[in-house]
Amino acid sequence: MIEALNFKRLQEEVHDRYEYNEQCIVGIIFARYDLQHVQRIIEENYLYWNYNTKRYLDIFWAGYGEYLCPNDESATKKILKFEGNDTRIYYDLESFISVKEQFNHYLKDKDKYKDKLQLVLVNYKKGKLRFDKYISIDLEQNLDDNYKKIREIFEYITNACRNLHDVVELKERMEKDKAKRWIKGITISNVSDVINV
């Protein structure tokens, strides 16, 4: 789980984390921390997801950062409240909106962010995040008591990404496993643009 306070920083972080010729699947999660159900999901799952995904699946949190001084908390900047938040991970509403707007710039109208808890899986290839093929999951369509379905989705994707390095491979695995039967809100799209920052 990695901070993504702005799109340029996200691209730089990805570039620094991976070798130029490395290929992998990267997740970007859009989660407005000011919503009660999002707070609860993060508080109950963040540490587990962070340790469980390891290097198999890096997930960047749009609008989230680290090391906010408690005195700098405000109506738009909130330190996440979960045990083990030693780096003072925080949510920045203004940064979230900025990343969302930049993200939407690269997507067709039907695929733009629609103010819901959303996980987008993209390829990292040749030094860049690629949006020519991606998988988007509307996690809010999978809400249930204790967020069991969302936890299952993260576990499924993490396990799949141990051996898969392209969203096309993940799409094929999901089809083979008939994942659309139990995961709601999956969109698999082709977008012609590649992010160039």
Positions of predicted regions on the chain:
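Ampiphathic alpha-helical segments that act as solvent-exposed interaction surfaces
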Residues: F82-R88, K125, I135-E169
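Membrane-inserting effector segments that mediate pore formation, membrane fusion
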Residues: K171-V197
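N-terminal leader/targeting and pre-domain segments
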Residues: M1-C24, K149-E175
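A short, hydrophobic beta-strand/beta-hairpin element that forms part of a small beta-sheet core
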Residues: D111-K133
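Well-ordered, non-membrane alpha-helical segments in soluble/globular domains
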Residues: L5-L10, L35-W49, I89-N104, L143-E155
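Local sequence-structure signature of Cys/Sec-based thiol-disulfide redox active-site neighborhoods
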Residues: I2-G84
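Eukaryote-biased recognition of electropositive, low-complexity segments
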Residues: Y124-G127, L143, T187, V191
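Thiol/disulfide oxidoreductase modules built on the thioredoxin-like
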Residues: V99, F103-D115
